[in-house]
Structures are given as structure tokens and as C-alpha cells.
């Protein structure tokens, strides 16, 4: 049996990041943790491109454009959707996740989805550092995995 090994070497990988500006304090924390981890994995700052969007629902459209541009090896979606008093939380959470998955499946470009969906600010704040860094790990691993197939 041939086993494909995990490869977290980010050297020479080109990464696009789409950051939702809604709940910006959470998004900025995710971005910092993500970029710090990308650097630790060997991704050069010049190989990281950031685009911001108003909210999570707008992320898939920009991710699709980035994927279609053939300028990126992988993409990362960052942001936070925090439950409010209306059904809007479910719509935004579900549709942004579906849109991101659709882009990934239709283009073959790996996308790490770190748009947090939480019940409250405290839950989001508790996840910022870990989820931001995990997104970096996920995208680098998936890029390298796809290269081995």
C-alpha cells in the first residue's frame, strides 16, 4: 500500500486570503494567526494576497475569481458569523459554507474555510488563534496532498 505523507512545507506556495470585514475584531485576529502560521510554514509574505469583502456571503464570489485567475495554489476564507436574534445566522452560515465548498469542488483549488460560526462573541474570541493557524495548516497540507495525487 502506498501511503501519502503529510507535507506542511509552504515554500513557493501562492496563497490567497479572503477576509470578511463583518465582526472585524474576530476577523483581524484570525488573519494575524493565519499569516503568522503561513510564515512559519515557509510561505513568503510576497506570496500571500489578501482581499477583503463586506461579509461572509460575499466571500465565495471573490474566492471563485481568485481560483479562476490561476495565480494561487490555495485559498483561505476568514471571518466570523455570530448568532443574533434572527434566522439570518443560519442563512449566512449555511450559504457561505456551501458557496465555499462549491468553489473548491468546481475549481479543484483547495480552500481552508475558517469562517467561524459561533453562538456568541466569547466563543469566537476563544477560537481565533487556533482556527486562524489551522486554516494555514489545512491549505498548505491540501495543496501538497493534491500535488502528490
Curated annotation (Swiss-Prot):
The active site is at 88 (proton donor). GO terms for molecular function: 6,7-dimethyl-8-ribityllumazine synthase activity. The keyword Glycoprotein does not apply. Pathway: Cofactor biosynthesis; riboflavin biosynthesis; riboflavin from 2-hydroxy-3-oxobutyl phosphate and 5-amino-6-(D-ribitylamino)uracil: step 1/2. GO terms for biological process: riboflavin biosynthetic process. It holds the Pfam family DMRL_synthase. (2S)-2-hydroxy-3-oxobutyl phosphate binds at residues 85-86, 127. InterPro entries: LS, LS/RS, LS/RS_sf. GO terms for cellular component: cytosol; riboflavin synthase complex. Keywords: Riboflavin biosynthesis, Transferase. Catalyzes the formation of 6,7-dimethyl-8-ribityllumazine by condensation of 5-amino-6-(D-ribitylamino)uracil with 3,4-dihydroxy-2-butanone 4-phosphate. This is the penultimate step in the biosynthesis of riboflavin. This is 6,7-dimethyl-8-ribityllumazine synthase. The lineage of its organism: Bacteria, Pseudomonadati, Pseudomonadota, Betaproteobacteria, Nitrosomonadales. The gene is ribH.
Amino acid at each position: 500500500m502506498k501511503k501519502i505523507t503529510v507535507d506542511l512545507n509552504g515554500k513557493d506556495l501562492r496563497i490567497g486570503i479572503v477576509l470578511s470585514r463583518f465582526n472585524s475584531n474576530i476577523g483581524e485576529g484570525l488573519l494575524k494567526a493565519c499569516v503568522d502560521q503561513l510564515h512559519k510554514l515557509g510561505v513568503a509574505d510576497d506570496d500571500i494576497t489578501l482581499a477583503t469583502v463586506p461579509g461572509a456571503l460575499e466571500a465565495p464570489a471573490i474566492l471563485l475569481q481568485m481560483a479562476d485567475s490561476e495565480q494561487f495554489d490555495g485559498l483561505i476564507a476568514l471571518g466570523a458569523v455570530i448568532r443574533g436574534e434572527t434566522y439570518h445566522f443560519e442563512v449566512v452560515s449555511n450559504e457561505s459554507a456551501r458557496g465555499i465548498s462549491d468553489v473548491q469542488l468546481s475549481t479543484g483549488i483547495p480552500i481552508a474555510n475558517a469562517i467561524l460560526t459561533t453562538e456568541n462573541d466569547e466563543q469566537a474570541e476563544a477560537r481565533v488563534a487556533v482556527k486562524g493557524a489551522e486554516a494555514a495548516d489545512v491549505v498548505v497540507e491540501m495543496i501538497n496532498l493534491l500535488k502528490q495525487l
